[in-house]
């Protein structure tokens, strides 16, 4: 995802009574494709992020910047799968129609090292509570329809720019990355192919209710200070 599922999260998949058990291996997370709900930056912004990350990676790590078309902020992880779970996806698509939420102003003004593999990511130093609220709304929509998602965790919205780079210098942010997020989508990330397949995109509506002002914004991965 951006926040990609951790090994523990992705290996835990709910098998719901009355539903066909979706074919999923309970082995290492890295051997499975991932299904998640995310928002992606506009193409021009994603290109700018990629270019800056690629420049930063040069001479610092052998890892390459994450491709433009794959940059995202994960909202909710669904699980890891051996094959595309079409039946589940149909149910998820129906649930996503229930989500009525406003567009979100996104600003990424800091970099940090996230996750056990020390991947480089962009985030907001003051938090992005509206994104946390949107993620909570999506989870509620899934629960109402008895659909699975990864165990609920606190959320630090972020865009991972270089995966598995180790403890490299943080990327300086001279001009914050800002955009208005107008939709979210259901994404299947194909393992080993560096490819996302979208299974639907849902608009955020300007006339929807405001997000709560007290959404908790807790660090999930305890990023280092930029």
For the regions a language model picked out, list residue spans one by one.
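Histidine-dependent nucleotide/RNA phosphoesterase domain, centered on the 2H-phosphoesterase fold
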Residues: 1-226
């Amino acid at each position: 995802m951006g926040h990609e599922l951790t090994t523990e999260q992705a290996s835990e998949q709910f098998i719901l009574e009355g539903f066909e058990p979706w074919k999923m291996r309970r082995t290492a997370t890295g051997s499975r494709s991932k299904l998640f709900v995310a928002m992606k930056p506009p193409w021009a912004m994603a290109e700018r992020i990629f270019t800056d990350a690629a420049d930063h990676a040069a001479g610092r790590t052998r890892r390459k910047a994450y491709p433009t078309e794959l940059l995202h902020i994960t909202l909710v992880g669904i699980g890891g799968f051996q094959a595309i779970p079409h039946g589940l996806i149909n149910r998820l698509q129906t649930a996503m129609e229930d989500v009525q939420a406003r567009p979100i102003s996104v600003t990424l003004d800091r970099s940090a090292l996230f996750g056990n593999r020390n991947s480089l990511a962009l985030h907001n130093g003051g938090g992005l509570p509206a994104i946390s609220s949107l993620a909570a709304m999506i989870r509620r929509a899934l629960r109402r329809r008895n659909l699975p998602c990864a165990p609920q965790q606190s959320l630090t919205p972020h865009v991972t720019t270089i995966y598995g780079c180790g403890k490299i210098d943080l990327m300086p942010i001279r001009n914050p990355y800002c955009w208005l997020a107008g939709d979210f989508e259901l994404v299947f990330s194909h393992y080993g192919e560096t490819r996302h397949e979208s299974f639907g995109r849902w608009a955020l509506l300007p006339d929807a209710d405001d997000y709560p002002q007290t959404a908790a914004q807790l660090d999930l991965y305890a990023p280092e200070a930029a």
